[in-house]
């Protein structure tokens, strides 16, 4: 399984799901890295986050669909409510809404898309009701990344990326306060309003989570 995901917390959850399913995993944190992987490695399954630092995951979905031979199963994931429709329109075979922690949801989706006579899969053909719990150290890493983006650049493109990134992380971590603040930032950005107060609120919450590991 190749996971194209910039959030370490979300990727850790998928890693645990793959581990419980008997599948091997590789990670790419951006489109560029994913393209390098796909030049030398042909996975059975690709799971692509839609909000990546160097572009939209739909770009990679479309590229994979145009390739021959095509990767067997192409799945998308996002914390956005509109993500599924966008991903399927781009050619994804299926979609995972964040948070993705249910082993049964993960296994059932992949197994439903695999040929019944496919013997080469590393995914076991059994389904478990277990939920995985990603390590919060990965969440801290995501907060450090968000803080770096906030300090570096607040241009429109970066604000859009930051909103997508934090929305997915907040949903994956069930962090309602961070999710609410991120949603307000996203609305203000779409309305082309001044973002000073919304950015300050998000930055404050990110710093709180970097300092206090018990917040989430």
Predicted regions and their residues:
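Conserved acidic segment of CheY-like receiver
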Residues: 1-9, 14-18, 46
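Acidic, metal-coordinating helix/loop segments flanking the phosphotransfer/catalytic sites
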Residues: 27-45
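Acidic catalytic/metal-coordinating carboxylates
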Residues: 30, 56-59
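Active-site residues of response regulator receiver
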Residues: 49
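The feature encodes the CheY-like receiver
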Residues: 53
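Short amphipathic alpha-helix used as the core "switch/output" element in two-component signaling
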Residues: 58-70
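Alpha4 helix (beta4-alpha4-beta5 surface) of REC/receiver domains from two-component response regulators
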Residues: 59, 79-97, 104-108, 112
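C-terminal output/effector regions of signal-responsive regulators
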Residues: 123-216
């Amino acid at each position: 399984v190749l996971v194209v995901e910039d959030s370490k917390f979300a990727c850790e959850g998928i890693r645990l799901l793959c581990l419980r399913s008997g599948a091997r995993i590789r990670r790419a944190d951006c489109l560029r890295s994913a393209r390098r992987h796909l030049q030398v490695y042909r996975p059975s399954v690709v799971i692509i986050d839609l909000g990546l630092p160097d572009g939209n995951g739909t770009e990679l979905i479309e590229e994979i669909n145009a390739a021959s031979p095509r990767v067997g199963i192409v799945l998308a994931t996002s914390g956005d409510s509109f993500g599924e429709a966008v991903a399927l329109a781009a050619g994804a075979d299926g979609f995972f809404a964040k948070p993705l922690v249910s082993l049964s949801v993960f296994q059932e989706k992949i197994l439903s898309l695999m040929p019944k006579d496919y013997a080469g899969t590393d995914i076991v053909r059994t389904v478990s009701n277990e939920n995985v719990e990603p390590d919060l150290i990965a969440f801290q890493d995501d907060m450090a990344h968000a803080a770096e983006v906030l300090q570096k650049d607040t241009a429109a493109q970066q604000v859009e990326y930051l909103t997508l990134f934090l929305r997915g992380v907040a949903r994956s971590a069930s962090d309602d306060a961070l999710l609410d603040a991120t949603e307000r930032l996203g609305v203000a950005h779409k309305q082309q309003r001044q973002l000073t107060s919304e950015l300050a609120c998000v930055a404050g919450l990110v710093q709180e989570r970097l300092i206090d590991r018990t917040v989430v």
